[in-house]
């Protein structure tokens, strides 16, 4: 079953990562000065990597979640049936695109495209810490990585949110319209309150997808293992756990591989917690949907 597989993965990560987690990083030959820095302990090493994963995922959610919810709302309540079906299919099809393709698209298209925007943001909004320079001339920024991640999580958030919107009882919608509400007022007063928990769970599942992304981020940004809020600079971007593993695992010694697997364990725990929270919210939303009265089918 799924629980057996998860338990097996967790046991593997714990057994392989425990030597580096419990090791003395100041005296161990392979860990002292690993990646050109004296970390002192495993936790000092994993903290900036975990921050990089969370920071890039947060940027993706801020950029992608509103767009995904807007697309879902358009498909479910505004688009004609002849347009809604093909549009939903195209959005769902994005989920089948490999990560490496998104990464190449980010390198070839998005990095040059976003460079003028980065210069504009730095020139006029540089007083905000997020947009401080120096601006990258190559486009290898966290902004570019966040945009690509936003596109990658778009299908899952859109699909789940669309289904939640479509499950809104018609009785609620028709009651709002009967009271004289416009279509937008009906959506705001009847659909959004009903779908709130479902939208939150969809966003959390998108977060889980973004946390584990590897190749796209590894190709696009020029990262370092540090705490940074910068989104426009080159070389001062926080490295992600997945990207760090992909870049360093092939050349690592046994103890260094243990350290990398240990960081993977931390990512596994965070991703599992996020997905369990999302599933719990979805389960609560599903139970409420079953209890709600339904009248007819949606036109």
Regions from the PLM with identified roles:
Residues 93, 97, 157-164, 168, ...:
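Transmembrane alpha-helices
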Residues 13-62, 80, 135, 247-258, ...:
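Periplasmic/extracellular loop-to-transmembrane helix junction in inner-membrane transport proteins
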Residues 22-47, 102-151, 221-222, 232-235:
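Membrane-interfacial helix termini and adjacent extracytoplasmic/periplasmic loops
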Residues 60-91, 278-287:
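Transmembrane-helix boundary motif in ABC transporter permease subunits
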Residues 47, 51, 55-63, 67, ...:
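Hydrophobic alpha-helical transmembrane segments of multipass integral membrane proteins
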Residues 162-166, 170, 246-299:
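C-terminal transmembrane helix and the adjacent membrane-cytosol boundary/short C-terminal tail
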Residues 1-11:
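N-terminal signal-anchor/first transmembrane alpha helix
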Residues 134, 217-268:
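Interhelical loop and adjacent transmembrane-helix boundary motif
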């Amino acid at each position: 079953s799924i629980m057996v597989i998860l338990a097996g993965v967790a046991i593997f990560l714990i057994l392989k990562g425990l030597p580096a987690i419990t090791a003395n990083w100041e005296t161990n030959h392979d860990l002292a000065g690993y990646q050109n820095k004296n970390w002192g302990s495993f936790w000092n090493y994993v903290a900036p990597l975990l921050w990089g994963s969370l920071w890039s995922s947060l940027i993706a959610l801020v950029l992608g979640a509103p767009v995904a919810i807007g697309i879902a709302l358009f498909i479910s309540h505004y688009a004609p049936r002849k347009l809604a079906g093909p549009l939903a299919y195209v959005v769902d099809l994005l989920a089948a695109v490999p990560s490496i393709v998104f990464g190449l698209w980010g390198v070839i298209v998005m990095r040059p495209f976003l460079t003028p925007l980065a210069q504009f943001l730095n020139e006029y909004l540089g007083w905000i810490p997020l947009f401080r320079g120096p601006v990258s001339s190559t486009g290898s920024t966290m902004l570019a990585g966040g945009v690509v991640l936003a596109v990658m999580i778009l299908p899952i958030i859109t699909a789940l949110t669309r289904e939640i919107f479509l499950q809104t009882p018609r009785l609620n919608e028709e009651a709002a319209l009967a009271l004289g509400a416009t279509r937008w007022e009906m959506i705001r007063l009847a659909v959004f309150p009903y779908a709130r928990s479902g939208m939150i769970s969809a966003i959390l599942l998108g977060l889980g997808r973004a946390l584990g992304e590897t190749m796209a981020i590894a190709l696009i940004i020029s990262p370092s293992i540090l705490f940074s809020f910068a989104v426009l600079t080159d070389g001062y971007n926080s490295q992600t756990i997945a990207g760090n593993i992909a870049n360093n695992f092939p050349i690592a010694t046994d103890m260094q591989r243990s350290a990398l697997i240990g960081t993977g364990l931390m990512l596994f725990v965070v991703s599992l917690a996020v997905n369990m929270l999302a599933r719990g919210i979805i389960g609560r939303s599903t139970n409420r949907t079953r209890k709600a009265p339904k009248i007819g089918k949606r036109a």
